[in-house]
Amino acid sequence: PGNCTNNPCLTGTNAIDTELGTTPKVVTARSLTVTGRVQGVGFRPFVYRLATTHGLTGWVLNRLGQVEIRVQGAADAIRLFEHELIALAPPLARPQIDASTPAETGQLYEFTIRESSTAGAASIHVPPDLFTCNDCLHELNDPADRRYRYPFINCTQCGPRYTLIRSLPYDRPNTTMAGFTLCPQCLAEYTNPTDRRFHAEPLACPACGPALSFASRDGTTAGGNEAALRACIAALRGGDVVAVKGIGGYHLLCDAGSNAAVTRLRQRKPRPHKPLAVMFPAPPASPLDAVLQYVILAPEARELLLSPARPIVLATQRPGTPLSGRIAPGLNEIGVMLPYSPLHHLLLNDYGAPLVATSANISGEPVLTDNREVDERLAHVADACLHHDRPVERPADDPVYRSICNTARPIRLGRGATPQEESLPFHLPQPVIAVGGHMKNTVALAWESRLVVSPHIGDMGNARSLAVFEQTIADLQSLYGVTAERVIHDAHPGYATTRWAERSGLPRHAVLHHHAHAATACDLSAGDAPWLVFTWDGVGYGADGTLWGGEALLGHPGNWERVASLRPFHLPGGERAGREPWRSAAAVC
C-alpha cells in the first residue's frame, strides 16, 4: 500500500488522475534487463531513487549478476527513466540495457527493492575492488563522524569487491563479511534505500566491523585500530620493515628515504635489483602534490594515478629527491602509487612521507593474504606485522601501468583492474580457458563473445603459484557460472601450465609463445589483411623445437608464418637466459 497523492496508483481504467477533471494519463509498464557493471556500485539504490523521482512504481532486483526492473507509470516518464538509467548512472557503473519489453500493468503502488534471485540464466559481471571514494575520505577525516579514522570505511561506491566475494549473487552472506554482524546503526543504513550505504555489502563501523592488530618480532603488540596504527608508524619511523594487510593481500612497507631500511628489505626478500614501488600521501584536497615533488607526470600519467584502479604508474624521477637510491638502482624511472584503501590513507597521512610498498611474498610467488601464513613465511623478512581480521578470499597484486604514446598500457593487471571484462568481435562455439605462460602468469576465461582476464598470479616455478593458479581457474568458472570445455596453453612441453592442461582432461590447443604475442598486437576489426609483427621477447618454444627469441611473423592470429628471425646461436644455460640476459651476450661474443 502507498499514498496515492505521492505514488501514482492504478485505477480500474489503467489511468492516473492527478487532479479532478483532468484527462487521465494512460498507465504503461515495461520490463528491463540491465547487464554490465551493475553489481557492487550502488546501482539498485540509484534505480530506486530514479524511479521514485519520476513517479514510477514497480521493483528492481539482482539476478545472478544482472539487474531486472519492472516500472509502471506514465509512458513519457518511463521513456525518461530509461534514458537517465544510462545517462545518470553511478560513476563506477557501466550499465547496458539488454532488453526492454512491454509488460502487463498490475497492482503496484510503490517502488521497491526486492531480494536477490538465483533463478534462471544471467549475464554475470564481477565487480573489481574499488578505491576509497571522496565521500568516505571526508568522513574518514571528520572528527564528528562515527567512522572517523576507521580503516575499513566504505560505501556502495568504494571498498573491496572481487577479493571478498565468495559466490554470487553479491550479497553480504556470500562475502568474507558474513562473519561480521551489523550493529543497529549500520543495519539502518544497510536497509535504507535512500542511504548511500544501502546494501553496501562490506559495510562496517568501529562497533561491528573488522579491526587492526599489531605484532613485532621483539614481542611488542597493540590491539585496537588507533593503538595498532600508532605502533606501526613508530616501527616505520624506527627503520623497520612492516608487513601490512591491504585489500588484495599484504604489502611490505618501509621508509622510502632510508637507504638502510630499503637495503634490509632487499636483502631479506630477497630482491637484490628489481625496482620497488613507492606509495605517496594523497590528501583529498590535493592528492598529487606529494608525488609531483618526486616525479615528472604527463597529463595521461596523472589520470592513471587517479583512475579507479589506483595503479602503480611508471614515471621519471626528478633529480635530487630524498628517495633512497636503492629503490630503483640504475634506472631513472620509479613506480609510484597513491593510497587506495582507508588504511593506506591513514598510514601515509600519519607518516607524512613516501613509503616503499612492495608485494609481501617470496619473490616470484603470488602476494600473501593469510595472517598466520605471513607470520610464518615472512618472519625473516618483516620486523612487524599490521594485521586485520577481514579475510581476503583471493589474492590480487597491485596493477602496474605506464603511458606509451599518450595511451595507458598495462604492464601487470591486478587489484582494482581485474577481473578485466572484454567483448570479443566473434562468438565462441564453446567456453575456453587460456592458462598462460610460465613466467608472470595470468589466465583468461572466454565464452560466447565475452572474455575475462584474471589478476597477475606470478611465476609458475613454485607450489604456491600453482595453487593460486588452480584456485583462480576454479574461481573464474564458479563466479561466472561457466565451465570450460577446451583449454589453450603454451606449446612448451615443460611449462607447469602445459602439464596442468594435460592433466585437465579437456581437449587441448597448443599455441606457440611468440604467436600469442603477435596476436595481441593485431586489430581484429581491421579485416583479413596480413600483419607483419616483430616479437622480441626473451625465449619461447618454437615450431622447430628450439627456443625462439626475436621473430618476424607474417599473417594474422591463428595463421602465422615465420619470415625472419635473429640468427640462431647456442644458449648457455638454456631457458635461464630469460632471467639472466648476460648468458645471451656471452653466447654471441
Which stretches of residues belong to each language-model region?
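Phosphate-binding/catalytic loop of phosphoryl-transfer enzymes
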Residues: 522-560
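Two-metal-ion RNase H-like nuclease active-site motif
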Residues: 40, 429-436, 532-539
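Hard-cation-handling environments
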Residues: 498, 554, 589
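Intrinsically disordered, low-complexity, mixed-charge
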Residues: 3-202, 206-213, 226
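Conserved phosphate-binding/catalytic loops in two-lobed NTP-binding clefts
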Residues: 490, 505-517
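Glycine-rich phosphate-binding loop plus the immediately following alpha-helix
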Residues: 278, 284, 387, 464, ...
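General small-molecule cofactor/ligand-binding pocket signal
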Residues: 99-101, 386, 509
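Active-site-adjacent structural elements in enzyme catalytic cores
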Residues: 117-504, 546-549
